[in-house]
Structure formats: C-alpha cells, structure tokens
A protein has these predicted regions:
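C-terminal regulatory/interaction module of P-loop NTP-utilizing enzymes
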Residues: 1-296, 350, 355
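Accessory DNA-engaging acidic/polar modules
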Residues: 291-355
Length: 355
C-alpha cells in the first residue's frame, strides 16, 4: 500500500492547487460550489450547461480560493479503469503500480473534477462506489482505498447525460442512469448576465494591457442578441463567453475590431458567419455589413480585410489602396469573377466606385 501511494504521486502538493485567475469574476453558482467544498462533506455534483460558459473554471477557482487541491480529469470515449484508478507502469525498468487521479484525490482528500463526463462510456462504471463515497477496492493490488476527509467530486457536461439530439455536442453519450443518480445535485449553468460578462471582458482586456469599455459593452450586447435568437430557434449557433474572450485577445494583437470579430467567426459556416457579422454591424457603425455581391451594382466598392503579408497577392489581382481608410478594395464585379478567392478577405460594400 505504501509503495503504491508513493509511486502514484507524480506532482507536488502545491502544484495541485489551481492558480487564482486575475481575470475571473465570481457569479452564478460559484458561491454554491465554494460552500460545498468548504463544508468538507462528500457531496458529488453534476454541473451542466452550454459550452464556454465557465463551468470548469468555476470549480477550479473555488478550489483556488479555498486553497484546495484539485485533480482535473478530462474524460473521453476511451477513458477507462486504468486511466481513472491506476495500473501497472514500467518505471526505471521495474513494473510498479501507479495510482490514477481518482485514487490520488481520494487519498489526499482533494476535489476530483471529471471534466466533460458525458463523453465517457460504460468503461467509467468503475466509479460507482467512489460516487457513493464508500471508497474503492483495487483488485489488481488487493487494496481497499477509503476516501480521506474533504474528498468530493464535481462533474461538468454539456448535456444532462441524455446525449445530444441536434449534433451540437458530437461524441456525448447517453449515460447510465445509475451513475447519474449517484450525484447528489445538478447545477444548470447559463451564460453570465450582460453586466457580469462585461466585467469578465474588461478584466481580460486589462490582463492584455488595454481597456475599451465601449467595445466590451458592444460585444456583450452582441452575444446576448445572438443567444436570444438561439433560444427562440431562429439560429443554430451561439457565441460563448470563451469566444468573446478570444475576440478581445485578437483585438489586443491586431488593433482592429473588424479583424477581431472576423477571426472569431471564421469557425462558422459562411451563412452563420455573415449573419453574426451583420448582427454586430448593427451595434457598431465602424464595422461594415457583409452583403451578397451578386445583388450589387458591378461598380460597388468592396473593401478587403487583409494583413500586410497579403498586400501583393490582392494587388496583383487588381485591388487598389485607399489611403484614407487604409484598406485595399476592389469592385463587386471583380469579386463575382472569383468569389472563392476574394471572400477569404471578407469583402464589404461601402460606396460607388470612384474609378
């Protein structure tokens, strides 16, 4: 038992306490999570909600505030007993038992965070007795491990364990009801209110060396507009808090709201990208609305979103430089001749061509 406990540890105790994030804003269920951890009672909790809204961060920052050790385990469809409880490993030419993160957390009375648990399969059923707080029998080394005081479990998921019918969360599975029933409570995590999300973005901006309250306000209003449309079934995609933070990061690098928005939207299909960009353009007149170039007068000017390394590429294909706007531009007619090439530069209509 002593050998397995020693060789099971691969990190110092201090490194198991999450770092406190300067950009973190406490909101929603944070106080509930912190209260449960502080109580020292075993009370497994299931936290569910759409992606990128801070479920995992909330648990880890609660541990950081309380200076509690946290073992975060990222669950996949391949996660099994060997990954969770431990197994025999070849170390320095010798085969020894090494505890897995679940057993390590139990021995140390730490918080166990099962991240994206709904990606797991029946191979995780080895956790049933652990979820009951009764400890675990390690049959391969004939040892029973009882949980130390303070041990508890949190699981995060995008679904409630019933899979994803719309395909948004591909890979999630229908979880075993007996496992789900072993969680004491379920917390439903929504996206942060606009006022809270703005605070999150402002803290992110400050961490990157700038502050733009106007931009932060427009971004949160934009995300709220899209989420309302999503809830009403008008659109199939959504803007997460994580994606808003990525917009802020892009702005810090490129110093352009337009570029920051476009970079964040590139992961979506063309129709969604155009719709989301148009949503933002309604809130910020510094951003031009993307339109269907085939419906425009052929002489309409289309400004391009390019970086310095692309200037020769667009120039050689007929683009001209506008000193006032500091942008390259072509006509709608030019775009229509090779839309696949020009659309990568997000051409936006502004005015009738001066040439």
């Amino acid at each position: 038992a002593e050998l397995s406990a020693i060789r099971g540890m691969t990190a110092g105790a201090a490194s198991l306490i999450p770092d406190r994030l300067k950009t973190y804003v406490s909101w929603g269920h944070h106080d509930t999570v912190e209260t449960v951890i502080k109580s020292g009672m075993f009370a497994p909790m299931y936290v569910t909600g759409l992606s990128g809204n801070g479920k995992t961060t909330m648990v880890m920052q609660a541990c950081a505030n309380l200076k509690r050790e946290c073992f975060r385990v990222n669950i996949t469809s391949a996660t099994d007993e060997d990954d969770l409880l431990g197994g025999f490993r070849l170390i320095n030419g010798e085969t020894v038992w090494q505890d897995g993160p679940v057993v390590n957390a139990m021995r140390r009375g730490a918080v166990l965070l099962l991240d994206e648990i709904d990606l797991g399969t029946h191979l995780m059923m080895c956790l049933q007795s652990v979820l009951e707080g009764k400890g675990i029998y390690l049959k391969k080394i004939n040892e029973f491990v009882a949980p130390a005081a303070g041990f508890t479990i949190f699981a995060t998921a995008n679904t409630k364990g019933k899979g994803s019918d719309d395909g948004r969360f591909a890979g999630t599975n229908i979880m075993n009801e007996a496992m789900l029933d072993r969680f004491d409570w379920t917390l439903e995590q929504e996206y942060a209110p606009k006022s809270t999300e703005k605070k999150i973005l402002l803290k992110k901006m400050k961490s990157l060396g700038f502050e733009d309250k106007d931009f932060a306000g427009r971004l949160t209003e934009w995300a709220d507009m899209i989420r309302r449309a999503f809830r009403e079934g008008a659109i199939d995609e959504i803007i997460t808090t994580r994606r808003l933070e990525n917009v802020v990061k892009a702005f810090a690098i490129f110093q352009s709201r337009e570029t920051a928005i476009d970079m964040a939207l590139n992961r979506f299909d063309d129709d969604t990208k155009t719709a989301f960009r148009d949503f933002y353009a309604k809130l910020d007149d510094t951003i031009d609305t993307v339109v269907d170039t085939t419906t425009l007068d052929p002489s309409t000017v289309m400004y391009l979103d390019t970086n310095f390394s692309q200037k020769d590429e667009v120039k050689n294909r007929g683009a001209r430089w506008d000193d006032q706007r500091r942008k390259w531009h072509v006509t709608a007619e030019t775009v229509n001749l090779d839309p696949e090439f020009w659309n990568q530069f997000n051409p936006t209509a502004v005015e009738t061509s001066p040439f």
